[in-house]
């Protein structure tokens, strides 16, 4: 069985983390040799950067600082975690990757998406995902889910208003148009179990 690099993307409240947990279980049951990781984070240094970027109390962070910190964390994640796993024949399942920077920082912060893309391509070099699953849900539905989920850890980006999250969604649409060959859009208004089964079926096709 070949190894591929898979990413999960979606706006806040899309159920991505829940689906990732279910996928972890289903992929294990299917006998897939893989690791599950996340961004920002995924390596000891990158997790420290995550705490800075997402920490409540860092609201004064400049948008370009945010882009550069996340790109730096991503570089370390690629070098320390993702590439070694792929080289060892393990599939990588990652909760968020470069596309999140394009949507959240590029579009959400009204920055030049091409510049954000170039910074990230410099960081990751040739380590692009083979397959990206975009969990598609309206911004207002996602934010309502966040508000209803009292056990969810709320980070600095969750506290942004609906306008910001709508910009993020528009940004994702631009990213999908940039890389249509690797994206699969998944209806995230369905149950986490239904979403997981849809994604798992496609993963098995990709690995065949």
Curated annotation (Swiss-Prot):
Coiled coil: none
Its EC number(s): 2.7.4.9
Keyword tags: ATP-binding, Kinase, Nucleotide biosynthesis, Nucleotide-binding, Transferase
Catalysed transformations (reactions): dTMP + ATP = dTDP + ADP
GO molecular function per UniProt: ATP binding; dTMP kinase activity
SUPFAM superfamilies: P-loop containing nucleoside triphosphate hydrolases (SSF52540)
Binding site for ATP: 10-17
Key word Cell division present: no
A cellular component term, taken from the record's GO annotations: cytosol
PROSITE patterns in alphabetical order: THYMIDYLATE_KINASE
UniProt xrefs under InterPro entries: P-loop_NTPase, Thymidylate_kin-like_dom, Thymidylate_kin_CS, Thymidylate_kinase
GO biological process: dTDP biosynthetic process; dTTP biosynthetic process; dUDP biosynthetic process
Top-level taxon: Bacteria
Entry function: Phosphorylation of dTMP to form dTDP in both de novo and salvage pathways of dTTP synthesis.
Family: Belongs to the thymidylate kinase family.
Protein name stated in the entry: Thymidylate kinase
Organism this protein belongs to: Listeria monocytogenes serotype 4b (strain CLIP80459)
